[in-house]
Structures are given as C-alpha cells and as structure tokens.
Amino acid sequence: MIIGIDVGGTHTDGVLLGINSPNGEGYEILATSKVRTQKDNLMKSILEVLDVLLAAAQVPDIKRIVLSTTLAANVIVEENYDPVGLVLIPGPGLNPEHLLIGDENILLSGYINHRGIEVRDLEQEELLKGLERIKARGIKNLAIVSKFSTRNPGLEAEVLQLIREKDYPFENISLGHQLSGRLGFPRRLVTAYFNTAIMSVYRDFVQAVEKALEERELDTGVFVLKCDGGTVPLDRVMEAPIETVNSGPAASIMGTMAMTGVYQNKETAIALDIGGTTTDIGLFIKGEPAFMPEGIELNGFPTLVRGLYSLSLPLGGDSKIAVKDGKLKIGPERDGPAAAFGGPSPTPTDALLVLDYIQDDPDYEGRADLQAAREALVALAGDLDPTEYGRCWQDGKLDLTEFASFIIDKMLASIVETIQEILASLENKPVYTISELLAGVEIRPQLLLTMGGPASALSPLLAEKLGYREEVVPYAKVANAVGAALARPTLQTTVRVDTAASYLHIVEAGIHRQLKAGEDYDLEEVEELAMAWTRKRADDETAVVEISERESFNVIRGFRTIGKIMEVRAQIKPGLISRPEGSEN
C-alpha cells in the first residue's frame, strides 16, 4: 500500500492506494481523508489524516508514504520568513549591485575563473568585518555564493570553515554549489537565498512528519514531492529544501496526469487546483506537463530549481473579501475559514453557498451556517460605492443573490485573466515538456481540468468564459494527494571533465578532484559516468536514466588543441509509477 498526503495552507488531504493487479503495478484508491491544516500543530493534522487512512487498511502494510506541501511556498509568497544575509563572491565582469537581495549583503574580493581555477584569495579581514555586521543585526540565516563555485567550491567552503572556527551563531546556512550543478550566478544566489529562508519551515515540517510516523509506529520509506514532479527521501530534504518549494502545485499537476486521460489523449489543457488559499495553474502540452528546465521563478526572481510550469494565484475559496475605497477586493489574504464556518470575514465560499452552488456537497451540507454567510455579505455590501455596483441593488435594496454572483464573476475573471496572460507570455517562445523542447508549437488549449473543493461548482463557469471543454478531475478534492503518492523518484547529476586542466567534477555528489594518472575521458564515457552516478545517488541500479544536456568543446592554446571540456547532465525523468483504477482512460 501507498499513502499520499498533501499538506496545504487550508486543508491536509490524504489517500490510501492498494495494489489491484497480479504484477503489483496497478493501484486502486482504498480511502481518502481531508482535514483542516493546523499550521501551529502540523503533526496533529498529519496524524488526523493518517488515522483515517490506516483505519481503512485491514492489514496496514504501508510500503511508501509521499508528502507534498505548499507551506514553504506560502511563506515565500507572503515574505513571512526571517531575515537572510548574503555573502557574495562575484569576481570581475559583473556589476553585483542589482544582485543584493539579502537583508544584509557582503561583497568579497577573491574569485574563481570559468575554468575553476582560484585566481585570487579571499581577504579574511574583509570577510570578518562583514560577518560581524550580519551578526550585529541579529541575522541567523546565511547564504554563501561564489561565481563558478560548481567548478571549484573552495571559496564557499573557506567562508563556511571560518564561520565554524569563529563559532558564529548562524542557524541556517546554504552554499550555492550544493544546490545545482548548472551555471548561472544570479540564479544561484537567488536559489541559495530562498533555500536558507525556508530551512526553518521545512525543519519543522520534517520533524512533524517524523513524530507523526513515530506516534503510529510506521517504519516505512517516506518521500517528499519536488518541484519537478519527482520525489526525494525525507531524510535528504534538508540538503536542498528549495527543490520541494513548489511541491503543492506539482502534486496537483501529477494528480491531473494520473486521474485523467490528458496524457494518453495527447491533449493541450489548462489544469487548475482551486484551493482555500491559492489557485494553482498548470499547463499540459500535447499531454505532457510544461516544464521549466532553466528554473522556476519565486516572487519574480529566477532560480536554478528545475520544476513543472505552474503559477500560484493568491485567490481561493477562503480568500478574504473586503471593500477598500468603495471597491470590492478579493484576497490575497486569507483570514481564516468562510464566515459560514465561523470565520471572521466573508469569502467566495460564502458567496457560493448563498448561490446554492455547493449546498449539497457532503463537505458543506449540514455544517455550513447559511445565515452567517448571508449576514457577512450583507454587512460587506454596505461599504460599496453604489454607482459602480448598480447591478447589485434593486429599488434601493441589496439583491444578495446578484451580489454573490458578482463576487464569483470577479473571482473567475481574475483566474481567466491570469490564464490568458500565461498563454500570451509563452507565445512565440520555445517551450519545454518533461520529455522535450518544443520549438514553434502553438499552445491552444481546448480543455480545462479542475480539482479542489469548489471545482464542481466553478469548472463549468470558468470553461464557458474560456471557451474550453471542461472536466472535473476524479477524486477532485484529494487528487493532489494521489499525484504525490504515485510520483516517481527523480534525480539529476552533472559531470564536467576538463582534460586540459586535468580535472573532474561530479557536482551534486560533491566530487571535485584532479584526474588520476592515465585517467582520460571522451564524451561517451562522460555520459556513462553521469548515468552511473545518477543510479548510484538514487540507490537504484535499475533506474531508467536519460541524458538531458550535453556539450563538448576543444581547449585551444597557441593554435593547437590541448584538451577538451565536456559537460553532461543525466536525470531520472519525472513521471508516474502507475495510474489508479477508476482514472479516465
């Protein structure tokens, strides 16, 4: 059996999957669970989900548990993290002033060149003064990033060593070279900055998971979904938590792929997960999820974190509705649950209840206080400028149904506008899927695939505005947890060989060494080395590994070739281990 759990900002969802085929490859959904996320007590939320799922398993033989979460992503979007200091070693040729995104920034002398050779040493006095400045401000989080550190991490390691020797009180530290094997100094420092920023949040998350499993005496493999739709073991998450920052949207996309026929039918579609806090938007092109191999963006900053293409709109069923200067405003804040469930502010969920769109839903029926929803909306309408919202009044009286309809129209208009902006931004650009680069492809979605609590109510309305066919994903309220449960483990390894300098780098494995006497490589051998190390790091000698990038060029000196520089990236491609019974064919 497999358990998938998605820890969202509003709800924690879970599914229990059991094998239903003789060869052990097919799965069926045995049980589901959905509880409110208690941010100050994650262990309790996870335990509540586990208890429901384990109770449904007559013989709880759990082989694998996979989790996804939006907690870290929400922290970044809301900028609700502790200050981070940046130690930058940029070297020549780049004005670093526009890179200073830390709460305190140190620019150091010394640098590594593009061949990985240390050209200039660090100046220790300069470094110590900078660290003292960060310490004086009480900053506990630090990111250390040197240009070309993937080709020689020596300067980053030297800074870390001095911090430890002097016993500086930094609690969370990221080194740029440990987060990606690819070049890109600006992207690397942003990646290191946000990796440090979410370390505390992820440490709490990992500890909550470990305690929950210990409470229920579960001794099994535990994984976390990454941004690229693959998984990483829980005990390795803290090596680079930034890789899982968008695991919530990735779970939605993988769940859509698992539970619908979009992949089999090679369709181009928009995927929506309408949650309580956000609406996550994904894109399928000819049946495969769109991919960002250069790196996702976080708060408008490009990173080196490879991931599925997604955009989280801070708009959901529990978004706070307010009136500012006589105008209606929905989100981005969430002020608790809907008024119908005891929350302090009206929300789109209250409007849906007033319109009787979700009244018969088992999750709302009998629990929702419809009168509280009505009263919250009536109180809100009193502050509106009637000249702009005339349709909501009839003969000087508020038409509550019309007002609720206006709220939902405004919410849908925001989602539709964002989808159209996404498609316009991709027009005439090369796009990637998890399998290939597509050049010159027209992205013309005809299908809308929706999941989340209000999906059944909102999907037809959205599809009408977009002019698409629509389909509510089976098990729409927990399909994200299905996507997490069935995601395949993934891994990427970068190998760089410089035969002229006689040096070998296996970046993600932390290997940077001189070539031994008689040790030589051609491009094919570098590819074999990259694939072998990918399997080794995944601890799976049977894993299917592919070469995602390769380059090779001669090193010329004095009009003659003195060696080659070869760089190869190998990866286990993201995908599903199976599709569950009951999904669309």
What are these regions (language model features)?
Residues 1-585:
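N-terminally biased helix-coil "hinge/interface" segments that flank
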